[in-house]
Structure formats: C-alpha cells, structure tokens
Amino acid sequence: MEVGISLDRALALVGTLSFARSTETTPLSDLTGRILASPLSSKVDDPAFDNSAMDGWAVRAEDCTSEGTILKIVGTSRAGSNQLPEVSAGQASRIMTGAPLPLGADAIVMVEESAEEGNQVKILGPARPGYIRKKGENLQKGQQILPAGTLIGPAETSLIATMGHHEAETVSRPVVAVISTGDELVQPGIELSPGQIYESNSYGLASLVEKMGASAKRFDVVHDNIEDLRTTLDEAASSSDAILTSGGVSMGEWDLVRRLMEDEGEPLFWKVLIRPGGPPLCGSWKGTPLFGLPGNPVSSHVVFLSLVAPWLARCMGADSKLGPRLADRVRVRLSEDIKGAPKKLCMRRIRIEAGEDGLVATTHTHQGSGNIHSMVAHNGLTLIPPDTDGKAGDIIDALWCR
C-alpha cells in the first residue's frame, strides 16, 4: 500500500481498478441520464423536405423584385399535408411554418409584410430564400451524430427522437454502494441527543453517483463495530459494482474502515496530498473496488469530484467531452490572496464568475472541511500547487464544478 501520494499518482492507481461493463436497450422515454453504449446515426434527413421557417407566402423571387407587387393566391401549404399547390408566374401560395415548399416557389414573404385582398395578395416586403429550411441542412440520413459515451440530456433526447430512434443501446447503470460510518450519526428528522449529528454524506454522495449516470445503493449507517462493518462490506461487495464509504479512514482508534481494509482487504493507497480531503483510502474488498472517503462532508465531496468521478466515467466508457463530468478545468484570476498548503495541492472552494477580462475567483464563506454550506456557496475549487500561495491577480488552474 502506498501512503501519502500525489493526486496524479492516485488517479493512476485507481486506473488499475475496474468493473464489468454491460449494455442494455433503453426506450426513448427513459434515455435521459443514460450513457450511449454505441454511436447513433440519423435514420432520416432533417428537415425531410424543403419547408418554410415562418407563416407567410410561398412565391417566386423573380415576381417580387419591387414593393407592391400583386399576386394571385392559388392555394395553401399546411404542415403535415402531402397535397402541394403549384406556384407559377404571378402567383403565391399561403404557407404555414414547417409546411412543405410548393412546387415552383423559391422564396417566402412574411405574413406581416403582405396585405391580402380577396383572392390576391399585395407583397409589401422582400421575398427571402433564407426563410426556407432546406432538406438535410441539419442532419443527413446515415450521418453519425452522437458518439458512444455521450451522456444523454434533454437536448440529446430530443435529437435522438428527431433522428428517428425510439430506443438506443446504453451502458447499464453500475451500482455503487454508499455507506456512512460512525456512532455519532443520526438520520435527519430524528431529534438529536448530545454528541450526535445528522448523517448527510450518504445523501450527498448518492446524488453525485446518480449525476454521473450510475445507480446509488444507500446502506444504513454502520456504527463503530468491526463485525457490523465487515458484514456490510461483504453485502455491498456481493451486490454492487463499487463501494463508497465515508468516515473511518484516518488514524484514530475507531477508524475501522482503514483497519479492516489493511487487515482483510486489498488496499492500493492511503492518504492523498490534497487539502481538504487528505486521508482517502482506495483498494478492493472481495474483488470490488472500494473508495474510503473522509467523514468530513466537504472532504468527501472534494475526493469524489477529483478522484472517484473521473474513475467512474472511465469505467462507464464515457466520452471525454460529451460524457458525464462534474468539473471542468479552467483558468481563473484570483480576486484575493489565498494561502496555499504545505506539501499539498490546495483545493480551496471558490466562486467562479465572469469578469471583464475572463473568469474571476472569489471566496464567500468559512472554509472548514465540515462546512458543507461552503460547497453550495461556491462553484469551484482551486488547484494551487503545494507550498505555493495564491496572490490577488494571479491566474491559476481551477475546477469549475457543474
């Protein structure tokens, strides 16, 4: 087991862990939040035919070179109709948004730029070819549009439907067990006794797991009993693809996750040189990847964002740009001095906002690792190198959390 390693080394070591990935066919209505297992190509041209981008008149542009031209109305082109009028010289057809372009027409006049007079229409504005949406200008039949590894959101779902697919092959959601440990933990809604606190980590971590496109399986709190912990880890290993624990990984007498992993598990490393989040443990329990996260809420979130999320995305075959990711690396200008951390990567919480000359980072709340409110008040983390202080005006690397 390696002890006290850099974040880059930790990422390299977790890269040796994995789980079996499977796929399944998912109906269109259930695709949001899923990851594509194979590329998707369009089954159709989009648009499928030349059509109007607005309500108005389908005309021949050569008939409308001057304002006040009067044309004979010869019919109407409606969306969904397969009966098209034909427009000849001196004629116009009513046309609705999305309706096919009548034969002979090559331009559209907006209805607001016309005056209808019986069976004639006076053209008061220009005829514009640009108001016509051309066949296949958005998508071409057979064109590959979405690569494997794409996280499907609302826009992707609509696009998949537009391409003619009623289902898609997706990565089966891996099951991630989430286990909080500690005698002091009580479920929200129960009145606290002296020395107790509400259990929050499993809810936050489960939400992060779900946001990555995986399925979280929350376990009941495991109190500080090594037999109970062993039983719970065994159950998690047999029913999950990966295990997240929070608490019990530091150097105290009751840090049982670390003790049990060292005695009976297969630990890869313990302690990463970051602040906050320094004492994470990683390895395998009964062949199942296990991440032992710190008990402090902020530390557990930071370790998940910087270590677990990239690993989970890779194991699910996520595309590096279109797949799930919870943070993007950006450059920001510090608006204030930030003290770094001796020998550790400083991941201070920051609020990233657009400034006049780029992204600006500020801090807004107390930075204690137990203050989960600071993760709400901020939307980023600094990446200040070890033994380095950040000065106001410095341009630094940061994670912009999504």
Regions found by a protein language model. Name each.
Residues L13, S18, W57-H223, T365, ...:
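Short, glycine/charged-enriched hinge/interface segments at domain edges or termini
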Residues D50-S52, D63-S66, L84-S88, L101-L103, ...:
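Solvent-exposed alpha-helices and their adjacent loops that cap or buttress functional pockets
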Residues V3-L7, H166-L293, P297-V303:
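Helix-rich terminal scaffold detector
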